[in-house]
UniProtKB/Swiss-Prot annotation:
One record GO biological process: proteolysis
Organism: Holotrichia diomphalia (Korean black chafer)
Superkingdom of this protein's organism: Eukaryota
Name of the featured protein: Phenoloxidase-activating factor 2
UniProt xrefs under Pfam families: CLIP_1, Trypsin
Quaternary state and interactors: Heterodimer of a light chain and a heavy chain; disulfide-linked. Can oligomerize into a dodecamer. Interacts (via CLIP domain) with cleaved PPO1 and/or PPO2; the interaction results in PPO1 and/or PPO2 activation.
Keyword Glycoprotein belongs to the record: yes
Similarity comment: Belongs to the peptidase S1 family. CLIP subfamily.
Regions crossing the membrane: none
């Protein structure tokens, strides 16, 4: 009997140990199981909207007061009626005007939606589990028309989810309403657990990593009504280029290693990186960011991610233009910089240091490569005064070496 007990116990504890090994392997590959979402699925973490009768009423004419204001993805686009929380409309292509809300609802992301008969939501019919189709993951894919909806009436606002690689580097312990600036810098996602940003942004945080965090998938900083939530991560290491000069901002590049990988979603993806020494010549590059003073601001329309289209400026012209400024005739543009802009009223001058400058891939214009990192400039949006950016192509080999030294794959910013 004792022998049988020992054998049984051996199998029980052996199975438990084996399961632990398997669980550890799963976590190693996918991250925490609670964070892993297979492609084709999503987790909605929004708070319940409450009873329908408590929602603001809307409607015009005969429907006046018979409809309710509800977030856009809770309204069926075909029947124009409210759906249960378990059913989320992800196929709508609404057009929202962020300047004038003509649908009577307080938020531009709310719609005036009809109530089901009797005011009671139908119980969703059970459906068999859907086996997700694994879609290939590509870097540099821009959602030009946005996700779910397209906005009108904008002034340089990006569409929702337009640039999935955009990341905000934030102070971790800002008290809401304190007036303290929350945004430290911008950045770009180059791998699930790696953010590329400017060294000048994070140099002072190397010994105080708990003071900052990153946020990916953000768009409008004053609402969480978007269908896809943003994701935040802590930073476990800051890697600054060893030759970074804080006084001249030469070699202004840094990598932020996250405490765990971000989960890929339609609003979160990576940007492609250029080959070493690659040169860009394009009028269709973009820079994006919120602006340090505008992030989370209550000033109207300043809370949505901005974009600005900029032309590249070749090195000789950029240096000549900058010599006409207070820099003087002896100024020499370091090879670690590239230039863009120089058009009246178009510049990255709102405190968006570390944010990406990206251009169409010359071999595949439907994808984007990161040309630069917002570094410095003279004035703001003046004619013939280009903005200056860290030259990402100059640092490609350095980025690869740092990634490989940490055992991280370079594939997410190549394919």
């Amino acid at each position: 009997m004792k022998r049988l007990f020992v054998i049984t116990a051996f199998f029980l504890f052996g199975a438990e140990a084996q399961n632990s090994v398997i669980d550890a392997a799963v976590v190693n590959i996918f991250g925490n199981a609670s964070e892993y979402i297979p492609p084709g699925y999503e987790i909605v973490t929004k708070a319940p909207l409450g009873a329908l009768t408590a929602l603001p009423r809307c409607g015009t004419g005969a429907d006046q007061g018979k409809k309710v204001c509800i977030v856009y993805h809770r309204c069926d686009g075909v029947t124009n009626t409210v759906t249960p929380e378990e059913v989320i409309n992800t196929t709508g292509e609404g057009i929202f005007d962020i300047r004038e809300n003509a649908n009577e609802c307080e938020s531009y992301l709310d719609v005036c939606c009809g109530l089901p008969e009797g005011g009671v939501l139908p119980t969703p019919s059970p459906t068999p589990p859907v086996v997700p189709v694994l879609k290939p993951s590509f870097c540099g894919i821009r959602n030009e028309r946005g996700l779910d909806f397209k906005i009108t009436g904008q002034t340089n606002e990006a569409e929702y989810g337009e640039f999935p690689w955009m990341v905000a580097v934030l102070k971790a312990n800002v008290i809401p309403g304190s007036g303290e600036e929350q945004l430290v810098c911008g950045g770009s996602l180059i791998a699930p657990s790696v953010v590329l940003t400017g060294a000048h942004c994070v140099n002072s945080y190397q010994s105080n990593l708990d003071a900052i965090k990153i946020r990916a998938g953000e768009w409008d900083t004053l609402t969480e009504k978007e269908r896809l939530p943003y994701q935040e991560r802590k930073i476990r290491q800051v890697i600054i280029h060893s030759n970074f000069n804080p006084k001249t901002v030469v070699n202004d590049v840094a990598l932020l290693l996250l405490d765990r990988p971000l989960v890929q979603a339609d609003n979160i993806g990576t940007i492609c990186l250029p080959q070493q020494s690659q040169i860009f010549d394009s009028t269709e590059c973009f820079a994006s960011g919120w602006g340090k003073k505008e992030f989370g601001s209550r000033h109207r329309y300043s809370n949505i991610l901005k974009k600005i289209q900029l032309p590249t400026v070749d090195r000789d012209k950029c240096q000549a233009d900058l010599r006409n400024t207070r820099l003087g005739l002896k100024f020499v543009l370091d090879q670690t910089f590239v230039c863009a802009g120089g058009e009246q009223g178009k510049d990255t001058c709102t405190g968006d240091g570390g944010s990406p400058l990206f251009c169409p891939d010359p071999r595949n214009p439907s994808r984007y490569m990161q040309m630069g990192i917002v570094a410095w400039g003279i004035g703001c949006g003046d004619e013939n005064v280009p903005g200056v950016y860290a030259n990402v192509a100059h640092f490609r080999n350095w980025i690869d070496q740092e990634m490989q030294a940490k055992g991280l794959s370079t594939t997410p910013y190549v394919e």
